[in-house]
């Protein structure tokens, strides 16, 4: 009799232990999925900006700016002596699920940061030497990386573009990364406790992953998920056109027109002497977290 009771107790204890192990494994899998979904490929944000050294948008409003549209771009960048300059460049969106730039958003310089910063930097920098590649194709690749899309799910055309701009080692790294579309029910659970702006970003990234995994999508569909409809109504703490001190010793003011075009104004003070400016080292970051981070390219877009 005691043997039978002990056996029942032992079986019950085994069931409890098995249930706990199963729950622990389930929680671990859930936590891993949450980490994979919520980890940002590019982490650059407004906290990376120097908000102490700024000048009013009205600074240098009475000055004449020398255009760099016909200037030579060298390995060191644009060679600038003391004075006032401006250049128009092609730029890229580095954050999906956000509002497009508007006159209400002020931008400051920040460095490129995050787990995928090297691959993102190479894509944009190497594009300068491949004028045959469309800007939209580079942007689509950037969105794929930012959305943490599985490289194997990308179209053959995009994979070929990546092969032109990246090394075999980089391609191998991309092959190892990425997620598939996460079912809506799972996504709802993952993002339920997160701030609304973060939820919108994660939802946009997930929808973009779904598009990349389909065989039939176009750029405008990707763009629709990357951009929130309307304008950001949140008042920016930094005015449009505000000047910020660049780490290279000059002052810079960003004037985006949409996410794909950027006018940059530069002031090189006498104390800085000769400086070198490489636009693709810059990320223009808005004070509003719901607006788009913009990465500059070295490709001119003079109009």
Regions found by a protein language model. Give the residues of each.
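Boundary of Sec targeting at the N-terminus
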Residues: 7-8
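N-terminal signal peptide c-region/cleavage motif recognized by signal peptidases
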Residues: 2-4
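Long, low-hydrophobicity ectodomains and other hydrophilic envelope-associated domains
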Residues: 163-303
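Extended, helix-rich scaffolding/adaptor regions
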Residues: 12-17
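Short, surface-exposed polybasic-aromatic patches that bind anionic ligands, especially phosphate groups
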Residues: 28-132, 136-140, 237, 268-296
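Mature extracellular/secreted ectodomains of secretory-pathway proteins
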Residues: 84-87, 91-207
